[in-house]
């Protein structure tokens, strides 16, 4: 395990000032090309890609941003803290296709939000209400309907201590034929551990549920996957993709030519510092989740103090959407690079 090394940046300030001044003379303005954007002290709660835009929430208000960080739409009266965009068959989308977003909030509601292709509000409806807080909804299109999950927490939320009493986290699965009426289907997993940052992929008749499992908030955590071959009726035992040697925060897991690629933000090089010591890593697996390589540090720009929301390919480029200094400044950043360049 590598030891986290702190860099004294005091000597960098004068040099950076000289560089900015030189750039101002050359280009007529100050600043350095960021290959994306930076929104300082944005303090958003969640963020996801929605096509070639971004959906995020600030003070539980939902906003749509373009890839330059400009707000192009917002929705009065809607409150969201956790969001999930259903993006099946994105490449074949047309102007008549609508976006469907699952979101949940501190009113113990899980909603389905429907937007037009250009982000006009069509309908917002409550899908499920719970007795206690429910986080991390997921929406999946099936052949004959939809599946929806949320993670309900009974007891202590985000227990901060290894000696504390953790709440029970239960990942509930619901089904619907019309996106309006939802029926309980099963509970995928229930643990007296934090179950967070879930995502589902549906491929060739199999559902894959990816998630983080940790004993206490910001402590060491596993990344796991469970599978279902009967439309979500029953699920396998968890397969551990990354062990709990660091605070691993899952962002996305996508199919590749050889199997799977998992993106996480992790304090692997600075264990114990959680978000403030985290960087983006990618991990490759065969189709059966046998590891090929793990904890490969991404060459993404500004890869320090990262809480990664999502990594996504758009028009041949890798796009990384993340918070910097999540627990303090909570800046929102987008960084882009050519596909393949994120590898060391």
What are these regions (language model features)?
Residues 3-5, 28, 334:
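A detector of low-complexity, intrinsically disordered, Ser/Thr/Gly/Pro/Ala-rich segments
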Residues 3-18:
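N-terminal Sec-pathway targeting helices
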Residues 8, 24-27, 254:
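Compositionally biased non-globular segments, especially hydrophobic aliphatic-rich helices
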Residues 19-22, 106:
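Conserved structural scaffold segments of CAZyme catalytic domains across common CAZy folds
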Residues 21-35:
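Bacterial Sec-dependent signal peptides at the C-terminal "C-region" and cleavage site
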Residues 31-344:
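Carbohydrate-active catalytic/glycan-binding domains of CAZyme proteins
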